[in-house]
Amino acid sequence: MPILTSYFGFLLAASTITPALFIGLNKIRLI
């Protein structure tokens, strides 16, 4: 099922990009 695979790929990307953006915003705020 390509749709299911792309869905899990999207969740994996979101779960890795979101914390990275959050940490980046915190670093910018600290500077």
Swiss-Prot record:
Signal peptide: none annotated. Keywords: Chloroplast, Electron transport, Membrane, Photosynthesis, Plastid, Thylakoid, Transmembrane, Transmembrane helix, Transport. It is a single-pass membrane protein. Disulfide bonds: none annotated. The keyword Electron transport applies. InterPro entries: Cyt_b6/f_cplx_su6 (IPR007802). One of its GO terms (biological process) is photosynthesis. GO terms for molecular function: electron transporter, transferring electrons within cytochrome b6/f complex of photosystem II activity. It is found in: Plastid, Chloroplast thylakoid membrane. It comes from the Eukaryota. The chain crosses the membrane at residues 4-26. GO terms for cellular component: chloroplast thylakoid membrane; cytochrome b6f complex. HAMAP family: Cytb6_f_PetL. Belongs to the PetL family. Component of the cytochrome b6-f complex, which mediates electron transfer between photosystem II (PSII) and photosystem I (PSI), cyclic electron flow around PSI, and state transitions. PetL is important for photoautotrophic growth as well as for electron transfer efficiency and stability of the cytochrome b6-f complex. PANTHER family: CYTOCHROME B6-F COMPLEX SUBUNIT 6 (PTHR37266:SF1). The 4 large subunits of the cytochrome b6-f complex are cytochrome b6, subunit IV (17 kDa polypeptide, PetD), cytochrome f and the Rieske protein, while the 4 small subunits are PetG, PetL, PetM and PetN. The complex functions as a dimer. This is Cytochrome b6-f complex subunit 6. It comes from Phalaenopsis aphrodite subsp. formosana. The lineage of its organism: Eukaryota, Viridiplantae, Streptophyta, Embryophyta, Tracheophyta.
